[in-house]
Amino acid sequence: MDSKKNLVLLGMMGSGKSTIGFLLAKKLNLRFFDTDFIIEKKVKMKISEIFEKKGEVEFRNLEKKVVLKFLNKPLCVISLGGGAFINEVIRKEAQKKCICIWLNWSSKTLIDRIKKNKKRPLVLNLNNN
């Protein structure tokens, strides 16, 4: 493992990126950055509110700016939002500069986790089914 590269946690919504990222950073004595949390603090809105009030395009533009900034931080663990890796610029930059770790779970596990969390912006209707 290249000890000079950041660790970036990727995965679908509900895969545990934030939880595992925090624990991994603590274990490795590194700083931890959750890009969704950083965006929420910056805009003073929850991710679901940003989607609702400003739309996904605006959110993805903001996400891109934040993620690219944090990919350049020295030696840290970064949790990306569930859809961040879809962006080609983010994906290429992360693959070039970081060690990317995909957290993979079954669809059933992800859906069960997401249904328990009312803050998930793209799947709020799952709770009604």
Q: Which residue stretches match the model-derived regions?
A:
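Phosphate-binding P-loop
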Residues: 1-4, 69-70
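Hydrophobic anchor at the beta1->P-loop junction of P-loop NTPases
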Residues: 9
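P-loop (Walker A) phosphate-binding loop of NTP-binding proteins
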Residues: 12
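Walker A/P-loop
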Residues: 18
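ATP-dependent small-molecule kinase phosphotransfer cores
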Residues: 31-95, 120-121
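A glycine- and Lys/Arg-enriched "phosphate-lid" helix/loop adjacent to the NTP-binding pocket
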Residues: 97-129
